[in-house]
């Protein structure tokens, strides 16, 4: 059943990348993966449900690939970041139309569930970039990490535009190396170790990806904790220590709600939850809200 579901998701992604979401029918997806349309409807009630599953599937693939790169001790932290940037550029080139929909798509074309999921995916990418920068450069960049995230996004956006209109395929290695070299120079020559952006601007930037309008921090915290508990409860007890993870999440929630939460304990608990590798979205958002 899992392989059949994966085949459908890969076929849908291929078609969404070649055309776009609104132009692809369930019948076309069925023909692409050589199944009956009825077989697809047994697994996905609608094209929107299929898209939601595909967004989650893509996100898990991205996180898994990044985790493998992070575990490659043969590479330096800077080389790992370079490879992550290249991987993202390659992914966009392979699935251009699909990522165009996520990045530039008309929100009127999707229902509220799809729009919310697209916002969550964008939020995950933003937090993933933040984490990748910290892993590469260390915690000394924490005071201005969001400045670097915005600069990284600006460079990525323009190079993605070039890839979008390219007539002859661009070499991605030099592009990735240029992006990292530019970040290196910015960090090296920075005159102040503080962010150039006021805190309210940073909050607006973070929240813009995860919601239709900025939400109160306490609301975002509550939503992220709820998602964390839900994610832990869905894990297999055979593969994960669900009881320990549940206890850690409960301790994190209790500490986060204190008037003066202890930073060392928050970092320790988030670090432990992060090690699972499968709770990326809620953990990244909690890290943003509670630590950086």
From Swiss-Prot:
Keyword Repressor part of the UniProt annotation: yes
Gene: ycnC
InterPro entries associated with the record: Homeodomain-like_sf, HTH-type_TetR-like_transc_reg, HTH_TetR
Pfam family membership, one: TetR_N
The protein's name: Uncharacterized HTH-type transcriptional regulator YcnC
Residues covered by the HTH tetR-type domain: 2-62
Top-level taxon of origin: Bacteria
DNA-binding region, residue intervals: 25-44
Gene Ontology MF terms in the entry: DNA binding
Lineage summary: Bacteria, Bacillati, Bacillota, Bacilli, Bacillales
PANTHER family: HTH-TYPE TRANSCRIPTIONAL REGULATOR RUTR, TRANSCRIPTIONAL REGULATOR, TETR FAMILY
Keyword Heme attributed: no
Gene source species: Bacillus subtilis (strain 168)
Key words of the record: DNA-binding, Repressor, Transcription, Transcription regulation
